[in-house]
Amino acid sequence: MKKPLGKIVASTALLISVAFSSSIASAAEEAKEKYLIGFNEQEAVSEFVEQVEANDEVAILSEEEEVEIELLHEFETIPVLSVELSPEDVDALELDPAISYIEEDAEVTTMAQSVPWGISRVQAPAAHNRGLTGSGVKVAVLDTGISTHPDLNIRGGASFVPGEPSTQDGNGHGTHVAGTIAALNNSIGVLGVAPSAELYAVKVLGASGSGSVSSIAQGLEWAGNNGMHVANLSLGSPSPSATLEQAVNSATSRGVLVVAASGNSGAGSISYPARYANAMAVGATDQNNNRASFSQYGAGLDIVAPGVNVQSTYPGSTYASLNGTSMATPHVAGAAALVKQKNPSWSNVQIRNHLKNTATSLGSTNLYGSGLVNAEAATR
């Protein structure tokens, strides 16, 4: 759906006998929450929306019950609707055989920790000396936006954060991530892993540093629709989402390499979406090549990169040092851009496997995955 949908009321063909004592007026006043409704197939989504619109704001589940829904977004490439409805109505809707799941549109946050190097450690300058700087490679930064900065060349983007139409960064996190990927090779500031890569600011997190699954899924959809080669997701949630997994899978099927932060709780399992099979999960290391104490690890961890005291661009044409797997992830996204420039015909899967195969082993795969990303070895 290419434009926002107004407030409407959904109906289903099911006849459900559920006691319903509230009036229509009181039902309309019930507090609604955001949900994601997954359907078994795309055609079912269209039929559901058509039925809703034809029902003229009256959803009749049975003689006793009506359900009011506000449609927020219909995804183009996955069979999912973003909606608002009363939690009390979820169980009734889930009985529709066309609906495969209904899940909360959960909050997702940045993976930065506190106020905190790594380009030389991943040996990016050696690749630069070979003429590999990420030229012609499109990298989408799904984050808090990217602020205008003399050390960054932002080529475009889009915002999927309600109430924040600008892609400018009101938080700082996204600007910092962008600099690690592609800070310019000029006379000022810092140097990125892929200084000639094309940066796209895809705003999916608000100024508070948090956002929703639906915003991130829309950002991934945008990345697929706009020919992005790499998508950096320095964000995550402890909770799985079927919608987010579908969005990752869809973007991957359209050629996007999805690179995501493993998480900052220090736990022995990684966060979502990094845990999904089609996302490249990145953990963080310190200056001694040890796992950063906060870096989540475990099954599914693909690779690690510097994530402690990482200096990069920041809003206000300034620079800052930050810690987090959020800071590690863009090192890998930048390295992917270098590999893509050298091997333009390679698929996202080939690039991912090559980065893992050329990483510097640091020990246990449980703690470090394939090892420390090595831009020099990856671009030989």
UniProtKB/Swiss-Prot annotation:
<feature type="binding site">
    <location>
        <position position="151"/>
    </location>
    <ligand>
        <name>Ca(2+) 1</name>
    </ligand>
</feature>
<feature type="propeptide">
    <location>
        <begin position="28"/>
        <end position="111"/>
    </location>
</feature>
<dbReference type="InterPro" id="IPR034202">
    <property type="entry name" value="Subtilisin_Carlsberg-like"/>
</dbReference>
<keyword id="KW-0479">Metal-binding</keyword>
<feature type="domain" description="Peptidase S8">
    <location>
        <begin position="116"/>
        <end position="379"/>
    </location>
</feature>
<feature type="active site" description="Charge relay system">
    <location>
        <position position="143"/>
    </location>
</feature>
<dbReference type="InterPro" id="IPR010259">
    <property type="entry name" value="S8pro/Inhibitor_I9"/>
</dbReference>
<feature type="binding site">
    <location>
        <position position="279"/>
    </location>
    <ligand>
        <name>Ca(2+) 2</name>
    </ligand>
</feature>
<keyword id="KW-0964">Secreted</keyword>
<dbReference type="InterPro" id="IPR022398">
    <property type="entry name" value="Peptidase_S8_His-AS"/>
</dbReference>
<dbReference type="InterPro" id="IPR023828">
    <property type="entry name" value="Peptidase_S8_Ser-AS"/>
</dbReference>
<dbReference type="Pfam" id="PF00082">
    <property type="entry name" value="Peptidase_S8"/>
</dbReference>
<keyword id="KW-0732">Signal</keyword>
<keyword id="KW-0865">Zymogen</keyword>
<feature type="signal peptide">
    <location>
        <begin position="1"/>
        <end position="27"/>
    </location>
</feature>
<feature type="active site" description="Charge relay system">
    <location>
        <position position="326"/>
    </location>
</feature>
<dbReference type="GO" id="GO:0046872">
    <property type="term" value="F:metal ion binding"/>
</dbReference>
<feature type="binding site">
    <location>
        <position position="276"/>
    </location>
    <ligand>
        <name>Ca(2+) 2</name>
    </ligand>
</feature>
<dbReference type="InterPro" id="IPR036852">
    <property type="entry name" value="Peptidase_S8/S53_dom_sf"/>
</dbReference>
<feature type="domain" description="Inhibitor I9">
    <location>
        <begin position="34"/>
        <end position="111"/>
    </location>
</feature>
<dbReference type="GO" id="GO:0006508">
    <property type="term" value="P:proteolysis"/>
</dbReference>
<feature type="binding site">
    <location>
        <position position="184"/>
    </location>
    <ligand>
        <name>Ca(2+) 1</name>
    </ligand>
</feature>
<dbReference type="InterPro" id="IPR015500">
    <property type="entry name" value="Peptidase_S8_subtilisin-rel"/>
</dbReference>
<keyword id="KW-0720">Serine protease</keyword>
<feature type="binding site">
    <location>
        <position position="113"/>
    </location>
    <ligand>
        <name>Ca(2+) 1</name>
    </ligand>
</feature>
<feature type="binding site">
    <location>
        <position position="274"/>
    </location>
    <ligand>
        <name>Ca(2+) 2</name>
    </ligand>
</feature>
<feature type="active site" description="Charge relay system">
    <location>
        <position position="173"/>
    </location>
</feature>
<feature type="binding site">
    <location>
        <position position="186"/>
    </location>
    <ligand>
        <name>Ca(2+) 1</name>
    </ligand>
</feature>
<dbReference type="Pfam" id="PF05922">
    <property type="entry name" value="Inhibitor_I9"/>
</dbReference>
<protein>
    <recommendedName>
        <fullName>Alkaline protease</fullName>
        <ecNumber>3.4.21.-</ecNumber>
    </recommendedName>
</protein>
<keyword id="KW-0106">Calcium</keyword>
<feature type="binding site">
    <location>
        <position position="190"/>
    </location>
    <ligand>
        <name>Ca(2+) 1</name>
    </ligand>
</feature>
<keyword id="KW-0645">Protease</keyword>
<dbReference type="GO" id="GO:0005576">
    <property type="term" value="C:extracellular region"/>
</dbReference>
<feature type="binding site">
    <location>
        <position position="188"/>
    </location>
    <ligand>
        <name>Ca(2+) 1</name>
    </ligand>
</feature>
<dbReference type="InterPro" id="IPR000209">
    <property type="entry name" value="Peptidase_S8/S53_dom"/>
</dbReference>
<dbReference type="GO" id="GO:0004252">
    <property type="term" value="F:serine-type endopeptidase activity"/>
</dbReference>
<dbReference type="InterPro" id="IPR050131">
    <property type="entry name" value="Peptidase_S8_subtilisin-like"/>
</dbReference>
<keyword id="KW-0378">Hydrolase</keyword>
<comment type="similarity">
    <text>Belongs to the peptidase S8 family.</text>
</comment>
<dbReference type="InterPro" id="IPR023827">
    <property type="entry name" value="Peptidase_S8_Asp-AS"/>
</dbReference>
<dbReference type="InterPro" id="IPR037045">
    <property type="entry name" value="S8pro/Inhibitor_I9_sf"/>
</dbReference>
